[in-house]
Regions:
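RNA substrate-binding interface of SAM-dependent RNA methyltransferases
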Residues: 98, 104-193
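Active-site/ligand-binding-proximal alpha/beta "capping" segment
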Residues: 187-237
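Short, structured coil segments at secondary-structure junctions
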Residues: 44, 64-65, 157, 162, ...
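Glycine-rich phosphate-binding loops that contact phosphosugars or nucleotide phosphates
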Residues: 91
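Structured adenosyl-cofactor binding patch, chiefly the S-adenosyl-L-methionine
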Residues: 130-134, 148, 153-161, 219-264
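Short pre-catalytic strand/loop immediately N-terminal to key active-site residues, enriched for Gly-Thr
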Residues: 27, 115-119, 230-238
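N-terminal positively charged helical leader segments and presequences
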Residues: 1-84
Length: 264
């Protein structure tokens, strides 16, 4: 059992919690909680860390034969955990690499989220979770978006991170041009949108662009989109939260496609 916060493994866990560079260099990320553990593909589990009390009371709940395991004292576990009320399970998970080509070659009609400089971990995790629920086929992120493997993002995805393909790209306008070549219409969520979002047809291949929480889409990214659309706003509110706006757009596409299928 590990009983000291000065232990080398404990220090590595804290590095993985706090530093995107450490996660990238090792090709792994740190996840936490029982529900996420059950969602994690077993072949991607590299190592499991359980609190002493969890191990004593609930070890028989888990089918983790063959997965390396360490027990941490409850005090050390609380030191490492990123949550206010730790559940008692931390684990190292191997990262999965996806390319833009992987996302575009799927047989399903493309429904993509394109995120420009999104910074809030909760927003990103919620968008990924909603994307899976709405039937999206992938997420494309500018290189300056928040790290997908940030612990707060991981928790917010509720397991969708294991199933929703995503890729970070260096040049977002160039990628938008590539999407156009593939017949995917790109829609920028923008205050200057020519049409309301529900006036467009999203039954064919589509990609929605969502920008930074405070500043929206960068001008060069907005200009690279084929169309600008807006969500109607009443009262004195100028715009919606990024994750809420993304959800509205994705579920409108989902609604249209479901309706279209019933007509065929």
């Amino acid at each position: 059992m590990i009983t000291s916060t000065g232990n080398a493994q404990v220090k590595q866990l804290i590095q993985l919690q706090k530093k995107a560079k450490a996660r990238e260099e090792r090709g792994i990320f740190l996840a936490e909680g029982i529900r996420m553990l059950k969602e994690t593909p077993k072949e991607r589990l590299e190592k499991l860390y359980l609190s002493e009390s969890f191990y004593e009371k609930r070890k028989n709940e888990l089918d983790l034969a063959g997965v390396p395991m360490e027990i941490l004292s409850d005090q050390v576990f609380r030191h490492v955990s990123d949550t206010q009320t730790p559940q008692g399970a931390l684990y190292l998970v191997k990262r999965s690499e996806t390319t833009l080509e992987d996302i575009l070659k799927q047989e399903k009609t493309p429904l993509l989220m394109v995120l420009d400089n999104l910074q809030d971990p909760g927003n990103l995790g919620t968008i990924m979770r909603t994307a899976e629920g709405a039937g999206a086929t992938g997420i494309i992120l500018s290189k300056d978006c928040v790290d997908m493997y940030n612990p707060k993002v991981i928790r917010s995805t509720m397991g969708a991170i294991y199933r929703m393909p995503f890729v970070y790209v260096e040049d977002l306008p160039a990628v938008l041009a590539e999407l156009k070549k593939c017949g995917i219409v790109t829609y920028a969520a923008h205050l200057e949108g020519q049409h309301f979002y529900d006036e467009e047809d999203f039954c064919e291949a589509a990609a929605f662009l969502i920008g930074n929480e405070g500043n929206g889409l960068r001008e060069e990214v907005a200009q690279a989109a084929e169309k600008k659309i807006k969500i109607p706003m009443y009262g004195k509110v100028e715009s919606l939260n990024a994750a809420v706006a993304a959800s509205v757009l994705m579920y409108e596409a989902c609604r249209q496609r479901r309706r279209d299928l019933t007509k065929k």
